[in-house]
Amino acid sequence: MENVESFTYLGSIIDEQGGSDADVKARIGKARTAFLQLKNIWNSKQLSTNIKVRIFNTNVKAVLLYGAETWRTTTTTIKKVQVFINSCLRKILNIHRPDTISNSLLWERTNQLSAEEEIRKRRWKWIGHTLRKSSNCITRQALTWNPEGKRKRGRPKNTLRRIIEADMKTMNYNWTELERIAQDRVGWRMLVSGLCSFTRSNRRK
């Protein structure tokens, strides 16, 4: 079997370091192509902004965030995704330099969550779906698996597991408690909404 540094699986790029940079870059490229192909939609005088944003969400943003629930996100990757989204939204609203608009007002006018919050929401929706699966499910076992042994010295890499565990610490829940809550879909949605609201308010401080 050939040893490769990265490969594509189910539309996502997997690299040997477990990072998501290559996949995020590819997703932005595909989303940009999708956005440019719909240029006539964005320039249309007959379509309302609301309809344009809905088309953006289903035809561009869906391409951009495909598989985002399992991304190993960093401040840099989040920023790249957000910059692309903001650029698209400004073009849809026909806002060009020297005209300016704050990000918060831009998101409010287009009914958007920040990229960070959107990805966190998708991630925890996926976690809830996974925790409702059979205990024999490999995906569920991998998600809740607790690796043993000592880690290497130095600053630990920012992995998907550490990102999830940081959110768990914020909510003050362990896997056993989350597995119980996940069985109640309404309760799970409330938990995810509360987490996103908490992180949003902290970001504004």
Kindly label every feature range from the protein language model.
Residues 1-205:
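Short linear motifs embedded in intrinsically disordered, charge-biased segments
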